[in-house]
């Protein structure tokens, strides 16, 4: 499994009602052993999470299943991350 950094950046039309469904999505990923860590940015402009996936396509699919992406509330960006 490779590590992928997922950035969630709030859009102007951000819907605060998507926060709880987003947390539920992260909980599902954590239960599957695919989430290493996650958290919001201190300025509340968005957040990031570290996702484990077999490929970039798998990571993008998991990140795009996030309600923040599905609702259009946040831009979701995925990068393969060679963290040491």
Question: Model segments located where?
Answer:
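Conserved, structured core segments of small domains
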Residues: 1-84
């Amino acid at each position: 499994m490779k590590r992928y950094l997922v950035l969630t950046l709030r859009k102007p039309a951000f819907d605060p009602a998507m926060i709880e469904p987003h947390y539920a999505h992260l909980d599902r990923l954590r239960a599957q052993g695919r989430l290493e860590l996650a958290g919001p940015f201190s300025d509340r402009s968005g957040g990031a999470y570290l996702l484990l996936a077999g490929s970039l396509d798998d990571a993008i699919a998991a990140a795009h299943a996030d309600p923040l992406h599905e609702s259009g509330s946040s831009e979701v960006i995925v990068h393969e991350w060679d963290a040491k």
